[in-house]
Amino acid sequence: MKSSGPVERLLRALGRRDSSRATSRPRKAEPHSFREKVFRKKTPVCAVCKVTIDGTGVSCRVCKVATHRKCEAKVTSSCQALPPAELRRSTAPVRRIEHLGSTKSLNHSKQRSTLPRSFSLDPLMERRWDLDLTYVTERILAAAFPARPDEQRHRGHLRELAHVLQSKHRDKYLLFNLSEKRHDLTRLNPKVQDFGWPELHAPPLDKLCSICKAMETWLSADPQHVVVLYCKGSKGKLGVIVSAYMHYSKISAGADQALATLTMRKFCEDKVATELQPSQRRYVSYFSGLLSGSIRMNSSPLFLHYVFVPVLPAFEPNTGFQPFLKIYQSMQLVYTSGVYRIAGPGPQQLCISLEPALLLKGDVMVTCYHKGGQGTDRTLVFRVQFHTCTIHGSRLTFPKDQLDEAWADERFPFQASVEFVFSSSPEKVKGNTPRNDPSVSVDYNTTEPAVRWDSYENFNQHHEDSVDGALAHTRGPLDGSPYAQVQRVPRQTPPAPSPELPPPPMLSVSSDSGHSSTLTTEHTAESPGRPPPTAAERQELDRLLGGCGVASAGRGAGRETAILDDEEQPSVGGGLHLGMYSGHRPGLSRRCSCRQGFREPCGVPNGSYYRPEGTLERRRPPYGGYEGHPQGYAEASVEKRRLCRSLSEGPYPYAPELGKPANGDFGYRPAGYREVVILEDPGVPALCSCPACEEKLALPTAALYGLRLEREAAEGWSSEVGKPLLHPVRPGHPLPLLVPACGHHHAPMPDYGCLKPPKVGEEGHEGCSYAVCSEGRYGHSGYPALVTYGYGGAVPSYCPAYGRAPHSCGSPSEGRGYPSPGAHSPRAGSVSPGSPPYLQPRKLGYEISAEDGRDKYPLSGHLASTGPLASTESPEPSWRDGSSGHSTLPRSPRDPQCSASSELSGPSTPLHTSSPVQGKESNRRQDTTRSPSLAPTQRLSPGEALPSVVQGVAEKTPELLTSSRPEQLDPSPFSQTSAPGSPNGWPQERSPGGHTNSASPRSPVPTTLPGLRHAPWQGPRGTSDSPDGSPLTPVPTQMPWLVGSPEPPQSSPTPAFPLATSYDANGPIQPPLPEKRHLPGSGQQPSPPARSTNQHVTFASPLPDVTQPPEHPLQENQSNVKFVQDTSKFWYKPHLSRDQAIALLKDKDPGAFLIRDSHSFQGAYGLALKVATPPPSAQPWKGDPSEQLVRHFLIETGPKGVKIKGCPTEPYFGSLSALVSQHSISPISLPCCLRIPSKDPLEETPEAPVPTNMSTAADLLRQGAACSVLYLTSVETESLTGPQAVAKASSAALSCSPVPVPAIVHFKVSAQGITLTDNQRKLFFRRHYPVNSITFSSTDPQDRRWTNPDGATSKIFGFVAKKPGSPWENVCHLFAELDPDQPASAIVTFITKVLLGQRK
């Protein structure tokens, strides 16, 4: 082959006049000739320790290698003279190299050059390359593409690559895609497995193990099989996989494998060593350590308390250093800190305190960003990934060379490090509390886009080369830019190449690892930028982006002070970058954090992936060497019975699709490690039906993989090859594949006496007469999908009412009739997108559920007809309700709490922020046990003084309202104690408002499971116990279906399922809202500490915990009573939305007010006040003028108490009651004085008439319903529930071979649950699923049909129930319609509205 000019000159410079392989030899190595040198302009990286050389170092006169003086003796590489300067400085592209990438070039002997390895990665050959195909070994190929190739050319190269592979290996190759999914990869290649993860990141250990196992399975199946590793961008992914497989294969390697191991090591050193990130090296070391057995696993829980970050004043000289942290667990966002600002020079270290402590388990990634001066951009400071079970001390330190991005950043000092402080309990670390310098302030306005963006939520959710639709867009920023990237799909002309050059190519040479080839192309002219989008295009973008992309007139301009952002950011005119939160669309119900907006419920994509934040981040040329350790492996077993599993399993961090199995034994099972120790109920948080949000609602699960080692049995691992240990992780047990840290060290706790208390940043608004709580009717979408509880404004909930007499809602700390966090059944009561549209959101009224879950107070009709839906408020985050130990076990069937009735998908980006309340957080993160002694012993009248412990929240010290702990009932006293007015001897639970809640003596949920809250059934009452003495409608106490035998009363034949029945006989009601946390009251005793949630938010409590011993329920607390008459139950409505507050107050007199929980700032409150005239700055109002007179103010919480934010004249108050009392005397900064109400404003709203032909849910459930259906199959969904579980089961049933044979079964729904009877006894005789085990029911979200033998199709539906014997795993039972008169929608509606709704 005739060489081109530059190549020929390069060969001549290296002393190889003849390019023949037989005669070519590198010149003799010479020793280095070092001399001292001061590096001023450009500081190089030390060739030994890979750390930037600051100041003086040594440099070789010949080869120019630089190192520290102390590292001079450690230099191992030989001295090689550099090529001619013209080649070192040449950046012109080589025009062509004939037949590169073709079969001929791969087999040509001259193509395998023997360049020394020291030149194989030299950046001197900076030419544009399109494909680097290397034979790592004879059976492992590596195909690398640049990060941003021209799409049209890239497709051509993929076709050429497929042709080369097909011609040389036929169908004997398996392609592993390590980047984003692509349609053309699947079309062009016979077998493709998708194992993608973000660029420059380390893959989780389970994915690493899965890839190695899949490679071994494929290569061992046939001697002619080969593996092709495909990636785009950085070749670090190739290095990670090749290194991991090198360690993996050495376990069973013989003498014949030694050469393959050597060539893999050479490949890593030659081709990818300098592109490996520190976290990638660390995970390779984890993997090798796990394989070698040199790991000492840490099985204790790990709570993160503090993170110490170095202060980098030179990071951005103009704005200073403004860091904030994001913490991910299994690539799911679990914590976002506030933005720290350093006023002046002085502090060298910043302490970021997490209160309460954050429980971490498994793969953890911590990213530190710097918030730009504009407030709309952010820059990555460092990123570090580690695994928790490798941590064995209280302190974990990462020096600069172990931090991604920072290791090559000159602004990051060499001596700086990042430090994490852990403990084994959520209690505060004993000793000196670290404090920040007084010059450090914190901004907790984490709703800003630059802080809230999560760059990983949408990775691989769509194919990279997807061409469906006229527009392709990324749903969210990738690199911290404030705008989503929206691009036209090229139609006729090829797209312009990316203006940013790809990374420097590697010389495609491998001296001892086989063939190599590189495709090179000439630089093409850059095409001019596209014109700005037209109006039609903007309208289309607005539809695609859910109202997040087009600026419109927002109503935020009329507010008095910009206390809350209301998600209004200036949009960028022109171009395709559209402002994310630039305005509001009138028709939008809320914004979803996935930035997708409205989308047809066309199904859930297979797989939930995250988008790499590093895709568009600046990248520096990496330095450093490859470190590998010869150690053992952990295998990700493949199981036949799980090949049919769908991949729409919620937030599996990297669950790839199944691909095409090569044979019956090969297929990729989704990654087995899932975080299951902290199980949360997904609930139905918000009105968003986009697939990304729906997938986020599912809970992860865990699986243990067996190790193929001789010592496995002794270590508790399965020694049977290929058989996975699929055990759910139990509390207190270590997660699988937990391996020790590499490159970081542990040290004892430091002395933090030198640190100083933090200064809480405040946003002061001078000269304001109004401090508006501008949360907006739209709210924001940064709330955790896994833990929030749904409440939709106009979407009603269904909660059977036993009595309808109006009654007061009680004080703020009472137990309301809302879903209890611990026993909340995931997605219970919700209707999948495939269900009939029962709801007309804008035509429905509202009503507020009282504390017993029975008495409803419908709001005025304006609530549903004016303005955006009230449900646009973001859901109440459950960290207010119980942030630890939540279980996915179903709620008790006797818990008449409400559940939302429509498919409300939660946000796909769970934002877990720290609130402004920092400091004196109550540290007893414990479960509380309700004692039955309080209610039976004393009844309090409305005007009677309450115990201080119970009334502590009625006094409204807001910091105490942090999170309600999961509670467990002690069943033993219930059988012996009977409270006055409690029928059937059921005990009664005292609530602060003077009410008594009857609790069921029989809890069907086990009380021994940690973190499980037993929500008591609010039993019937025949006496009045409302504050105003109004009688409650009595309910018959004869309810054999609730207290009798498991079988329902056999009074009459079971009717069919009603087709058009309204299951709520008591008028429209408000959707369910979670409880506020209150302190363990009198008569309650703390149970062992529960685990923290996956989500995290910090609060503070200026008062100590008030946990009284159970022996003294009331006596010790009377002295602390401060209020003779508590009026907070009249004005504190924590669960009201903004629109509901407006509807209640717009017709009131000036001075009428309500206080509710802020839905934009956790821990804060919103004050809605009716004023006489609108403020002068208010803009013209197009709606009801009376609505403009309801103004909103933000009440912030802090260590000093509560105050109205935005006005410096406002003082702090110890409680909300004190604030209200003072402002009722003097308005201070408010427009007028507050008028304390004397009665509940909800009672003044007339009740909606009840049609006489409606059947109550209780009557329907008592009677039951049944019909015949086709039973298809049952599919294990692990911890997955909700519509994703039904979609997964449907996919499994429709894709399994052979197709399951359906059986006709009798399907009966009663108060006890669901009973299936196989009349023909083909599969079983009878199966019963108790109501407490059923968590969800819906039709197939993708509306797929079951094809019967006669060709007719039937709708598929199913219900999700707990797997017997396992508190964490679920099973989805799938059915198809049989009787046309009994459609699936009617069955699902009956289960959802009646069965699941009744038990709440």
Curated annotation (Swiss-Prot):
Which residues are connected by disulfide bridges in this protein?
none
Localization of this protein = Cell junction, Focal adhesion; Cell membrane; Cytoplasm
Bias (Pro residues) ranges: 492-506, 1046-1056
Keyword annotations: Cell junction, Cell membrane, Cytoplasm, Hydrolase, Lipid-binding, Membrane, Metal-binding, Methylation, Phosphoprotein, Protein phosphatase, SH2 domain, Ubl conjugation, Zinc, Zinc-finger
Superkingdom field: Eukaryota
Start and end residues of each SH2 domain: 1131-1238
Region of interest (Disordered), residue spans: 425-444, 488-536, 809-1114
User: Record's Gene Ontology CC terms?
Assistant: cytoplasm; focal adhesion; plasma membrane
Domain C2 tensin-type, chain residue ranges per copy: 299-425
Q: Which InterPro entries match?
A: C1-like_sf, C2_domain_sf, PE/DAG-bd, PH-like_dom_sf, Prot-tyrosine_phosphatase-like, PTB, PTB/PI_dom, SH2
Membrane topology term reads:
Peripheral membrane protein
Q: Which CDD domains match?
A: C1_TNS2 (cd20887), PTB_tensin (cd01213), SH2_Tensin_like (cd09927)
Q: Where is the composition biased (Polar residues)?
A: 433-444, 898-917, 929-940, 1082-1098
Reaction(s) catalysed by this chain's protein? O-phospho-L-tyrosyl-[protein] + H2O = L-tyrosyl-[protein] + phosphate
What's noted about post-translational modification? Ubiquitinated following sequestration in cytoplasmic aggregates with SQSTM1, leading to proteasomal degradation.
Where are the zinc-finger regions (Phorbol-ester/DAG-type) in this chain?
31-79
An example of a Gene Ontology BP annotation on this entry?
negative regulation of insulin receptor signaling pathway
What residues does the Phosphatase tensin-type domain cover? 122-294
> Phosphothreonine modification sites?
91, 474, 909, 977, 1173
What is this protein's tissue specificity according to the annotation? Answer: In the adult kidney, expressed mainly in glomeruli (at protein level). In the newborn kidney, localizes on the basal surface of podocytes along the glomerular basement membrane and not in endothelial cells. Low expression levels in anabolic skeletal muscles.
Active site per the UniProt annotation: 231 (phosphocysteine intermediate)
Where in this chain does the record put each PTB domain?
A: 1266-1399
Quote the function comment for this protein: Tyrosine-protein phosphatase which regulates cell motility, proliferation and muscle-response to insulin. Phosphatase activity is mediated by binding to phosphatidylinositol-3,4,5-triphosphate (PtdIns(3,4,5)P3) via the SH2 domain. In muscles and under catabolic conditions, dephosphorylates IRS1 leading to its degradation and muscle atrophy. Negatively regulates PI3K-AKT pathway activation. Dephosphorylates nephrin NPHS1 in podocytes which affects mTORC1 complex activity.
UniProt remark on domains: The SH3 domain mediates binding to phosphatidylinositol-3,4,5-triphosphate (PtdIns(3,4,5)P3). It is also required to ensure podocyte integrity while the phosphatase domain is dispensible for podocyte maintenance.
By sequence similarity, the record places it as follows: Belongs to the PTEN phosphatase protein family.
Listed name of the protein? Tensin-2
- Native species: Mus musculus
Write the gene name: Tns2
